[in-house]
A protein has these predicted regions:
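Terminal, compositionally biased segments used for targeting/anchoring and flexible tails
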Residues: 1-92
Length: 92
């Protein structure tokens, strides 16, 4: 896995986890303030190894750590718009 691939996957997981937490506020309540959150993918041991190494390097003394084990990441959808219709008009 290249550095770029690791960065891209980390960014995607962080974004998706943030969206998940916004939709499921009970998750946010389980994360201690100031915790280091480490996102791991069940089907990607190479990514997980790098994520853990990075977390170990970044963790501050006494900082709580929360491991989030993600079963899988669904493929992205291109858009959430449903059947948009365009209309060319000469004026409003």
């Amino acid at each position: 896995m290249t550095d770029k691939e690791f960065f891209d996957k980390s960014l995607t997981l962080s974004f998706e986890f943030s969206r998940y937490v916004i939709a499921h506020s009970e998750i946010d309540e389980q994360i201690p303030k100031g915790a280091l959150v480490v996102l791991l993918l069940e089907d990607d041991p190479e990514f997980n190894e790098r994520a853990i190494e990075l977390a170990q390097a970044q963790r501050e003394t006494g900082q709580p750590v929360v491991i989030v084990r993600i079963q899988r990441l669904l493929p992205p959808t291109e858009s959430r718009l449903v059947n948009p219709k365009l209309e060319l008009v000469s004026s409003l």
